[in-house]
Amino acid sequence: MAQSTKQKVVIVGAGPVGSLAALYAAARGDEVEVYELRGDLRDPSTIPLNFTKSINLALSERGINAMRHSNREEMIHKVLEEAIPMHGRMIHGRDDGKLWEAAQAYDVHGRYINAADRSTLNNALLDELERTPNVNLFFNHKLTGADFRANKAWFERRIPGESTSDRVEIQVNFDYLIGADGAHSASRYHMMKYARVDYQQEYIDTLWCEFRIPPTDDGDFRISPNHLHIWPGKEFMFIALPSADKSFTCTLFAPAGHYARLKSSPQNLLESFDTHFPGVCPELITPKDLQEQFETNPHLPLISIKCKPHHFDSSVVIVGDAAHAVLPFYGQGLNAGLEDIRVLFEIMDKHGVYNPDISPEMRTLSRQAAFQAYTDQRIADAHAINDLSKQNYLEMRWGVKLPLYKLRKSIEETLDRYVPSLGWQTQYARVSFSNQRYSEVIKAVRRQGRLLGFGFISAIVSGVAVVGILAWKRPREASVLSVLKSSARQLGDVWRSKFR
């Protein structure tokens, strides 16, 4: 006789990752309860945890594919309809007093990433959950404790305006809990009381502050809406992403010491922008608005988190930033979190967690095996995108201007376009336009680098050999051979340092 596959699933966190997890569990017949510390995220008065009103997200293939597997086509259509395609980077600079901009396409096949508004995405997911009968949403509930051996959790209801004495704590039983409550995760904190978790947290010496480029007086974009705009500056950078209201959401990334200098004097701020980010002020943001936004908007740190395992027994698994907060420089934080959900439920399906013909006891054992398999697979990928995101910061703030970066990109894109059978792709294309595991991306890119390096050195050696033969025939030209040998050694050193 077939057993019921219904499980009680508690999800902590109603952001995009937690909401997608709820849709996946609900689609499999589970009874789902979602608990969120903040008020209803669809309410404009709800204050985000980072105290910023709007953060644009880069939504790419991994995130879209994960949402696609929820089988909610109308929801996905709504999100993408309001998103803005970004076909590449637009690099800004100034030479000899003249402003310039140079476009760098993301992909030779015309693929693009999407600038999506966080609230639009989150609202669409929450609206879908509210229409789902086996899902219940609980806002203003803080996770205060959990017993992951007894499968119990405690939440404190915190209604704004209530005194602490009026707060009520409730107990919730569950079959398993998904922690999707961000970098400062309470789920992870309580899981670490039961699992032996290796945990690494790092704050890099970079702060970020949000700015806004308004639309023109005619209500249009001031700069190209189909690019991610970058003003690179070695130690810092300024970026701008398009928004649906024809404005741009901008971010200044800089060391804490640089922020301190900017805060010391309004003139320092204006001079710094003129020197390092030419064309931003006054062309796109007035000096008054620039100063006001810098003083009003918070200057926030960037956190990077690695941990393992991502689960305990059959009762809890953490996903998204709770498991692997990454720096924002690859635009993969959201995409990796949404991909977590697809991978997790695919593994649970593979292990028969939702098989109607097994007993509750066997279902628990299957879930335990699935969570272990998820940890074993996902840790390598989570650590990989963490490392890639750190590396991409250097590329964005300086590497995009280097000739060697452009050379390698050109070679790899040429091979991708004209010899597709080789399976050659740039690192960016593999990360943003495929569902290849992040850990496999690193291996593939390293392999390509070695092959390019071998071809590069071979070309130099061939040239040296030709000149050597000529020099042997004409001894008076032997000095040419010496020069070429020296040049070959130097180029080889450059290649190894840049492309290894």
UniProtKB/Swiss-Prot annotation:
Q: Matching Gene3D superfamilies, A to Z?
A: FAD/NAD(P)-binding domain
Instruction: List the disulfide bonds in this chain.
Output: none
GO process annotations (BP): 'de novo' NAD biosynthetic process from L-tryptophan; anthranilate metabolic process; kynurenine metabolic process; L-tryptophan catabolic process; quinolinate biosynthetic process
Q: Identify the cofactor(s).
A: FAD
MF terms from GO for this chain are: FAD binding; kynurenine 3-monooxygenase activity
Give GO cellular component annotations, separated by semicolons.
mitochondrial outer membrane
Q: Where in the cell is it found?
A: Mitochondrion outer membrane
Q: What EC identifiers does the entry list?
A: 1.14.13.9
Which EC class is this protein assigned?
oxidoreductase
**InterPro entries for this protein:** FAD-bd, FAD/NAD-bd_sf, Kynurenine_monooxygenase
Q: In which pathway does it act?
A: Cofactor biosynthesis; NAD(+) biosynthesis; quinolinate from L-kynurenine: step 1/3
Chief localisation class = mitochondrion
The chemistry this enzyme catalyses reads: L-kynurenine + NADPH + O2 + H(+) = 3-hydroxy-L-kynurenine + NADP(+) + H2O
Keywords assigned by UniProt?
FAD, Flavoprotein, Membrane, Mitochondrion, Mitochondrion outer membrane, Monooxygenase, NADP, Oxidoreductase, Pyridine nucleotide biosynthesis
Job of this protein? Catalyzes the hydroxylation of L-kynurenine (L-Kyn) to form 3-hydroxy-L-kynurenine (L-3OHKyn). Required for synthesis of quinolinic acid.
PANTHER family, A to Z: KYNURENINE 3-MONOOXYGENASE
Which family is this protein grouped under?
Belongs to the aromatic-ring hydroxylase family. KMO subfamily.
UniProt protein name:
Kynurenine 3-monooxygenase
Q: Which organism is it from?
A: Aspergillus terreus (strain NIH 2624 / FGSC A1156)
Q: Corresponding gene?
A: bna4
